[in-house]
A protein has these predicted regions:
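Catalytic alpha/beta core domains of metabolic enzymes, predominantly
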Residues: 1-79
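Flexible, glycine/charged-enriched surface loops at secondary-structure junctions
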Residues: 3, 74-78, 113-124
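Flexible glycine/acidic-rich beta-alpha junction loops that bind and position SAM and/or redox cofactors
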Residues: 14-16, 51, 81-90, 119-127
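General N-terminal targeting signals
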Residues: 21-23, 56-57, 92-94, 111, ...
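C-terminal helical cap(s) of enzyme catalytic domains, especially alpha/beta-barrels
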Residues: 82-115
Length: 128
């Protein structure tokens, strides 16, 4: 069915920290290979917070990059004009002011993925 999308959102664990749900975006290429379905990643749901990494980049941006560089077809991210007033998922929502930076970062990661793809198409010694 071409109208079905597989979405990686993570699963609840007893650890519950540092992120809301455990997810391994290394599964993106595996799921694409096994199911032939488009794969969506949901870094908002898996990270669950607006935490900032020690390098100054929000964890949600890092998780997005991990999924996209692994070949995800799409991203599901929570945005809200005022996350503190959101009825659900406010703690993980990015603001609308952060959308341009998010899109710029997504474009950068997508370009990196496409370049990686070209590099491996040029190499003939990698075979399953």
């Amino acid at each position: 069915n071409t109208r079905v999308i597989f979405c990686l959102r993570g699963m609840k664990t007893s650890f519950n920290t540092p992120h809301r749900n455990m997810v391994d975006f290394a599964h993106v290429p595996v799921i694409k290979r096994m199911t032939r379905m488009p794969v969506c990643i949901d870094p908002s749901h898996s990270v669950g917070t607006r935490a900032i990494s020690s390098d100054g980049i929000p964890d949600i941006f890092h998780a997005t990059a991990q999924g996209l560089v692994a070949g995800a077809n799409m991203v599901l991210v929570d945005f809200h004009p005022n996350p503190a007033e959101a009825l659900v998922d406010g703690p993980q929502a990015l603001t609308l002011d952060e959308l341009p930076l998010f899109l710029e970062d997504v474009e950068l990661i997508r370009e990196t993925y496409l370049k990686r793809q070209q590099n491996f198409k040029a190499v003939t010694k990698f075979h399953a």
